[in-house]
């Protein structure tokens, strides 16, 4: 991803990689192959993923929409959108159930241009002959590889957070229930020896 100012135009550089035996018929084919490689490199870059992950956690929104016209217990979430940091655990779990049962379609949203700007800022070097090529590879990486992966990761993190909260709430509610006498107004004794 070195973008020197003196590097050749990407289309010119791609001419040297034309090889009909390998299925690379034109410079455009070679450039597409290079685009795929650069997109993979960007997608695998831990620093880029960390930046975009943090951006998604701060600015992302969860949206759920009804998949059909029928009424269900999930009607509250038929046209629902909430910032990720403000979602309550019970909302996440209900939305997940609604999606699993086929009543809801759920997506995690982040303004595409905001995500692409953060990616380009980390990668593109202004003035480089390859600048437009790198911008194109950034868009491909973001749309095809990075964002879908981050969306799945965000959903998984939300579900994990919601489940942990539900377990803690259950534990808090269970303790007093277990500590009360089994029969009200009667003393219960254990006579087992040992």
Model-identified regions with their sequence ranges:
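Duplex nucleic acid-engaging cores and interfaces of nucleic-acid transaction enzymes
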Residues: 1-188
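A short acidic Gly-Thr/Ser loop motif
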Residues: 190-194
